[in-house]
A protein has these predicted regions:
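Conserved core of the PLP fold type I
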Residues: 59-170
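N-terminal small-domain helix-loop-helix segment of the aminotransferase-like
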Residues: 2-94, 99
């Protein structure tokens, strides 16, 4: 954090959070941003217009209410989830990763993931005060199954991320 922060605010923010660095967004002019799952092409004009009409007809000034249950059930059916299982929906992967870390924030808990990988795995662990254990991919950016298994046995993490292929290696 910046040294210009008001002293009263500095006392309220954990030291480990103050020492964190901002998420760096690399210059990408002229590049296809595969690491951010962005489509380099705009939607066709007719589709943009149709989506605009549909979005304009929605009651965006209200919470979804029971409509979220209908959406969740439809998505679970489409994914073929077994009875008794559910989906967790959120505003993007950062929010879902943070919520999982928050839910598992108990003394001694940790998070484990392959490296390099999605930066939010380690960042969410740090923000929640959880230990993060990274396991290096092989030199060919393949999952090192033996190293992952050994790390899981050694650390017994509350969360093990296996997003593979992952961001930014695939």
């Amino acid at each position: 954090m910046n040294d210009d922060i008001e002293p009263g605010l500095r006392r309220r923010i954990r030291q480990d959070v103050q020492s964190m660095h901002a998420y760096a967004i690399q210059e990408s002019t002229g590049m296809v941003k595969l690491d951010a799952m962005e489509n380099p092409h705009r939607l066709p004009a007719d589709l943009q217009e149709a989506l605009g009409r549909r979005l304009g007809a929605l009651a965006l000034n209200r919470y979804p209410g029971s409509r979220i249950d209908t959406l969740r059930a439809a998505l679970a059916g489409h994914a073929g989830l077994p009875e008794g299982f559910s989906l967790m929906l959120g505003n993007g992967s950062d929010e879902l990763i943070s919520l999982l870390a928050m839910a598992c924030d108990v003394p001694g808990a940790s998070i484990l993931a392959p490296l390099p990988g999605f930066v939010m795995y380690a960042m969410s662990a740090q923000l929640q005060g959880l230990a993060f254990h990274g396991v290096d991919l092989t030199p060919d950016f393949e999952l090192d199954e033996a190293a992952m298994s050994a790390a899981i046995r050694a650390h017994r993490p509350a969360i093990t991320y296996l997003a593979y292929p992952n961001n930014p290696t695939a």
